[in-house]
Amino acid sequence: LVVRREALALYEDCKAAKSVRITAVGKRTEEIGAPALYNLAELQKDANRYHSLTAIQVQEIAQGLYEKKLISYPRTSSRLLPKDVYDTLPPVMEKMLSRKEFRQYADTVDLAAPRDSIEAQDTMEHHAIIITGTQPGKLDREEMLVYTLIVGRMLETFMPPCKVEYTTVDAVCAARKFRIRTYRILEKGWLGIFEREH
């Protein structure tokens, strides 16, 4: 209640002042790189965040997709790929980009550029979760949600960075100092895959 009263008093003071003096404006641009490929923990986190699936559900769904030969081994903690697996990706990515929901990104995905998602060593026990390129048959709703997350993350990983402009405005009103922060996306880059906020 005290905070509410103070806020209302501040609002009335500023309303009475009828003017605001801008004392400083600052801008900066930042590039936000694409996220790494999924391991099981990150897949569970995103599936819960965006689709309200539990960790157990995601683990079981991912295991089912693996048994259908649609994705690589899911119970992994790695978010990297060994070079020999990376070298098999171009035809897999082509199949992904032929899907209507991702076709528009065909000219943006760049497999040639070195990425942090590649590991120099030739072998590793279980690499990051990727799709195999086998076309999915009939999947139920939850299977398709998890499968689409994995497809989308693979595309995101090989997309350009997201470019964001941050603006800070310092102002004075009714003898009170205010700082306002906002941002706008200049280039969506990888963030455009699922059209999410950064």
Predicted regions and their residues:
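Core catalytic DNA strand-manipulation module of type IA topoisomerases
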Residues: 1-198
